[in-house]
Swiss-Prot record:
EC assignment: 2.5.1.75
Cofactor: Mg(2+)
Designated name of the protein: tRNA dimethylallyltransferase
Binding site for ATP: 11-18
Length: 300
């Protein structure tokens, strides 16, 4: 039965994931957000949070609930997802995971990775390295000890950079070598991938950035700075936010410089997402507009 399964819908940034949700019947499904930045309060525009009209149309979970200074990890997400799926199924609805954080989707499908515990002594050591020598030193260290992990990570994701080094310093084994996983708690999964041509994506990314600016992104950034959020705030690791930190370290950067960098980073991120998702097995690929009827018939 369709009600017994779980649905994944993923694709690169700006592919049009949110738009298709307006066509989903609210009485048959609920959405579980799979985005590591949209979870944060106050970081609204550059994170492309679902708008009020979409949230009203169909219920969303794991959006706009976490304080910006809090870390959000795979482990927290996985535990929350388990609980929410049970709640949705009790309502006789279909749980639909929607987003672009590929790392989360991978472990929803394959199971939560088993990595060793790290002592407080090791954590303090890595934090001291960061304070004394900076992020660039940690990245250099990670590239030396675990190039596989280095190539996988967002270079602004300081939490996972530190975590990777902590595991290595604790065990002498790169975190990428810890392949043992529990069996996934999620069964009977339908995986829907959304795709467009890369040229189309680049155009849509540029349009989206202009829409963000017109929606007040600059005011939002200034407001976040005025509240004391900075480079140590986990929410600021997201594209569209992290670039504005350059205004503090490189005040000669113009707004156009920042916007160009956001565009460049967004395009590179979309490319990484496409590469990652293309390697996932059992994916049914669709164009979000041309194949909309096929998507709806498949899910519902």
């Amino acid at each position: 039965m369709k009600e017994d399964r779980i649905v994944f819908i993923f694709g690169p940034t700006a592919v049009g994931k949110s738009n298709i949700l307006f066509h989903f019947p609210r009485n048959k499904a609920e959405i579980i957000n799979v985005d590591s930045i949209q979870v944060y309060k106050e970081f609204n525009i550059a994170s492309s949070k679902p708008g009020k009209s979409l949230m009203k149309h169909i219920k969303h979970h794991l959006v706009d609930f976490l304080e910006p200074e809090k870390e959000y990890t795979l482990g927290i997400f996985y535990e929350q997802a388990l609980k929410i799926v049970k709640e949705i199924r009790q309502k006789k609805k279909i749980p639909i995971f929607v987003g672009g954080t590929a790392f989360y989707f991978k472990h929803l499908k394959d199971g939560f990775p088993s990595t060793p515990l790290v002592t407080s002594k090791i954590r303090i050591y890595v934090n001291n390295l960061l304070d004394l020598k900076g992020k660039s030193h940690l990245l250099k260290e990670l590239k030396n000890v675990d190039p596989i992990r280095f190539n996988m990570l967002n270079k602004n994701d300081i939490y996972r950079i530190k975590r990777s080094l902590e595991v290595y310093y604790q065990t002498g084994i790169p975190i990428s070598q810890f392949q043992k996983k529990q069996n996934s708690e999620f069964k009977n999964i339908l995986i829907v991938g959304l795709k467009r041509s890369f040229e189309d994506l680049k155009t849509r990314i540029s349009i989206r950035i202009n829409e963000m600016l017109n929606s007040g992104l600059l005011s939002e950034i200034k407001g976040l700075f005025s509240k004391g959020y900075n480079e140590n705030t986990p929410a600021f690791k997201g594209i569209g936010y992290n670039e504005f930190l350059l205004w503090k370290s490189r005040p000669w950067y113009s707004l156009n410089d920042i916007i160009s960098l956001i565009n460049k980073n967004s395009v590179l991120y979309a490319k990484r997402q496409m590469t990652f998702f293309a390697k996932m097995p059992d994916v049914l690929w669709f164009h979000p507009e041309d194949d909309l009827d096929d998507i709806l018939n498949l899910i519902f």
